[in-house]
Amino acid sequence: MITQTELDNCLQWAQNNGAFIDPKISFRITEDAGVSAFVNEKFSPKPDQALIRVPETLLITSQQALSEFSQAANERSLLNSVTQLYLSKLKFGTDAVHLKSFYKPYLDVLPLHLPQPYFWSTDEVMNLHGTDVYLTMRDTLNKLVKEWRMLFQALSIEHSSQDKQFLSLFQENKDSAVVPLEQFCAHINGCKLEDSEWNSFVAYLWSYCIFNSRAFPRVILGRAGTDRTNLNEGFLYPIVDLLNHKNDVPVRWEMNEQNELCFMSQTTTFSAQDELFNNYGNISNEKCLLNYGFWDSSNKFDFSRLTLKLPSTLVSGLPVDFNKSGNFVTDDGETTILQFSLKISEPLPPVLLALFAYLSKLKSEETPTVRSVLEGIDQLTSVVSQRLLFYKNFKIKTSSTQKLRPHVIKLIKLYYQDNKKILNATTEKLSVLQKKIYSNNKEFSLSFKTIFKNDKIFANSLLLVFGAINYEDLITKDCLNDALLLWIVKLINDKSNNQGGFIKQTFKEVSDSIVIEKEDVMEFLPFYKKYFPNLSERIPEIYSVGDWGIRQFIVADTAIDRLVWIRKSNKEPIFLMKKAYDLQI
C-alpha cells in the first residue's frame, strides 16, 4: 500500500502543475479501500461546480504514448494498447523514458500489487474453475497476449528475457488455440513485479489492470480527430482516478475552455466525512471483481450469466432477434452461443422464456402453445437447476503448498453465494410462472391421474395388464406411457364417452393427415405384440371394442406429443387443449 507521504506528494505535484482540488475535499488512506476522498464539511455543490480540475497536460493519453512510440502513429487500432505499453514503460522503465521524471509523483501512487484476480495465486484462481469469471479471465489473458505480441511486432520491440518460456506456449500453439488459465497463473505468480522489465508480459498486464480500474474514455476530451466510435481508447486522469468507484453515483466530466478536465459531482448535498465517489458506469459484481478486486453483495446491477450452446440451424429458425436483444455471442456455422443475464430484479428475461418455448414447440405448431411453454419452463428449470447445483456444491479447495488469503476466500465465497441467490430467484420465478399458467388454463386440461381415479373399469384392467394397484405403480413400474396409449385408443373407440373432446379432435386431425411409413410400424411392433391379441382375449369388454389396430397407437403417440405435458413434480401426464400462448416479447 502507498504511504501518506507519497499521496501528499502526488496531490502537491498536481496542484503545482495547475490542478485545482476544492478545499472542502481531503484525500487519505483507509484500511479497507486504500486511497479515498472525503468531504470535510456539509455542503451542497452546484451541478456545474468543478470540485477537481486537472490540466490536460497532466493526463496520460495516446498523445504522450506516441511521443515515446512514434512508429505507432499509423496503428490506429492499437492506440489503447500503445498507451498501456507507455504506462508500463513509465512505471518499470529507466529514468530516460519520456516524461517519467515528470509523472513520478503520480506513478508512485499507482499500486504495484493489485487486488484483481489476474494476480491471485494458482490455488485461489482454481477455486473459480467452472465459473464465468474463470472463463472470462482465461479468454481475456489469451486475447491480451495476442494483442501484446501484435503490438511488439508492429513496434519492433524485443520481448523480455523473463518471458522466453512463457512465449513458447503461444509459439507452439496455433493462434486459435486457448492456453489454460493455470499456465498463465504459474507464469504471473513466478514473476516479481518489482523486478520486472517494462517489456515483460506481467508489466503489460499490470498496466492493463490499471487502465481497467482507472482509465476514462478519450471521447470525453472532445478533441478533434478523436474516433467517437472507439469507446475502448482510454486515458489516465490523475487525482480524479484516486476516487473510489460506486454504482448509481451521478457525476459529470467535462473539458472547460482552459483545457482543464473538470470533475463535477451531481450529488445534491454532502454531510461532513461523506466519501466522494466517482462512477465509471453502473457495473456488475463480475466487473467489480475483475476491474477493481472487490465485491458488493448489495449491487443492484449484479447478474448471473447463463450461457447456452445450440445448433446454429435451430437458432436461425427462431423468430427472435438475439443480436437485437443483446444475447448473441458467436456463431461458427455449427454452434450458436447465447448468453442471458439473470438478475434479482429480473430473474427471468422474457427473451429467455421465449427461446425455450420455441425450442419446445412441435413442427406442427405455428406458434408456442400453453403446452410448449410449460414444457419449455421444465427444460429451462433443468438447465438453471444444474447450474445452481454447481454453486451449491462448492467448497474451498487448496493444495498443501499454498495458503489462501482470507480476503480472497471471502471474495470467492461471496461470488458463489450471490450467484446461488440469483439462480434460486430464477428457479422460484419459473415455478411460480408455471403454476400460474397451468392454473389459468386448468379448464382446458385433463389430468391422467384424475382419469385413472374416475375410470374404474380402465384402472382395474391395468391391474391385470401391469399389476398396477394404484396410479403410483404406473410410475414405479415404468408403464405410464403404455397406459396413456391404451387409454387414448379406448377413448377414441368409446363413442358414448363425451370426455376429452379436444383429445378426440386432435386424434382425428392426426389420423387424417399422418403418413405412416414402414419404419413407424416396425418401431411400434414390439409394443403392439406385447399387448395384442392377449388383451383382446383377456379383457374383451375393453380391448375388443372398436379398432385396436397398430395404426391407432401410432396416431395416439403423435397425439400425446401434441397434447400431453408431464408435470415434473409428480410425473403426472396432463392433456392440454391446443391453445396459443402470447409470449409478449
UniProtKB/Swiss-Prot annotation:
Q: List, for all copies, the residue spans of the domain called SET.
A: 23-281
Question: Can you supply one Gene Ontology CC term for this chain's record?
Answer: cytoplasm
Claim: Cytoplasm is one of the keywords in the record: yes
Q: Which keywords does this chain's UniProt record carry?
A: Cytoplasm, Methyltransferase, S-adenosyl-L-methionine, Transferase
**Signal sequence bounds:** none
The parts of the chain that form a coiled coil are none
GO terms of biological process kind:
methylation
What Gene Ontology terms describe what this protein does at the molecular function level? protein-lysine N-methyltransferase activity
The domain of life is Eukaryota
For this protein, what is the EC number? 2.1.1.-
- InterPro entries on file: Efm1/Rkm1, Set10/Efm1_SET, SET_dom, SET_dom_sf, SETD3_SETD6_MTase
Q: Where does S-adenosyl-L-methionine bind?
A: 280
Q: From the Swiss-Prot or TrEMBL record, state where the protein is found.
A: Cytoplasm
Q: Which family does it belong to?
A: Belongs to the class V-like SAM-binding methyltransferase superfamily. RKM1 family.
Role description: S-adenosyl-L-methionine-dependent protein-lysine N-methyltransferase that monomethylates elongation factor 1-alpha (TEF1/TEF2) at 'Lys-30'.
Q: Beyond the main fields, what else does the record say? A: Present with 5170 molecules/cell in log phase SD medium.
- Please identify the protein, giving its name as recorded: Protein-lysine N-methyltransferase EFM1
Q: Which organism is it from?
A: Saccharomyces cerevisiae (strain ATCC 204508 / S288c)
